[in-house]
């Protein structure tokens, strides 16, 4: 049976999973024009949840969305978007904005962000750097693997997560990207996650990913790889028109490739490693721009 049918028949009230799972379920909910009966809460982690998905699930279907972040090394949850009592005073759009964050740290979890120079960065909601965590439920090394332990831990005992994040004064953490997925264009950073989430809001895009591709002038430029709904035909101009008021102009992807499906890992995440290998020799048509 489909996931929709399974949840409907079993009267599932709450469910946990990665965004790829929920995007597929949401597509079926649109077709059925309803949600699975009794379904009222979902927790999503593993990768960033698109704003458009949160808005639609909450506004159109009445499903409460909670965003989370974690790692196996954190046992596994590190943060969730529990809004607290102050949420009563927030508008719907303000609540959605907070839910695009990966949330506030769990009890006993400490978080900090560190710049490329190794210095601590302020929790001002603007500065971003590598997210590092420490706590009673977080590893201090890998069993019988000293080399991996040394690479993963700082000298003062913090775990290097490999995620790039910013943290607000109120303690809300938002992932900017994985360190290996950031795009450095002309010396400036572009977040593949932010660009993906913006593009994901297009009504004809079912799923998408952004990777860097070589550019002779800028070093790297974003390449959007997308799956469309019901074989809808789009082009780069359509994508730019949609994204123009959502991201900086220099963030706009230099090209878009449409595919039948994206590769996924065993846990349902989009496999950017596979995409990078597949498009490693990609050349932009207008690379002189």
Regions found by a protein language model. Name each.
Residues 8, 15, 135, 140-141, ...:
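AMP-binding/adenylate-forming catalytic core of the ANL superfamily
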């Amino acid at each position: 049976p489909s996931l929709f049918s399974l949840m409907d028949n079993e009267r599932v009230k709450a469910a946990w999973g990665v965004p790829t799972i929920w995007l597929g379920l949401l597509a079926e909910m649109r077709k059925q024009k309803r949600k699975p009966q009794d379904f009222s809460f979902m927790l999503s982690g593993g990768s960033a949840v698109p704003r458009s998905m949160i808005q639609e699930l909450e506004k159109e279907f009445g499903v409460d969305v909670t965003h989370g972040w974690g790692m196996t090394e954190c046992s596994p949850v590190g943060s969730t978007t529990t809004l607290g009592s102050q949420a009563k005073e927030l508008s719907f759009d303000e609540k959605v904005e907070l839910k695009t964050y990966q949330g506030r740290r769990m009890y006993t979890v400490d978080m900090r962000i560190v710049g490329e120079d190794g210095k601590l960065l302020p929790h001002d909601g603007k500065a971003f750097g590598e997210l590092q965590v420490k706590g009673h439920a977080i590893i201090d090394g890998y069993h019988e693997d000293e080399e991996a332990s040394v690479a993963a831990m700082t000298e003062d005992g913090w775990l290097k997560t490999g995620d790039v994040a910013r943290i607000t004064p109120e303690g809300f953490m938002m992932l900017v990207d994985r360190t290996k997925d950031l795009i450095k264009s002309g010396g400036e950073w572009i977040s593949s996650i932010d660009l993906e989430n913006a593009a994901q809001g297009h009504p004809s895009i079912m799923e998408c990913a952004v990777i860097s591709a070589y550019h002779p002038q800028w070093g790297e430029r974003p390449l959007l790889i997308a799956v469309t709904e019901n074989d809808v035909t789009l082009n780069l101009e359509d994508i730019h028109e949609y994204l123009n008021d959502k991201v900086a102009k220099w963030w706009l992807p230099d090209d878009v490739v449409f595919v039948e499906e994206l590769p996924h890992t065993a846990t349902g995440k989009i496999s950017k490693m596979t995409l990078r290998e597949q498009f490693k020799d990609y050349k932009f048509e207008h690379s002189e721009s």
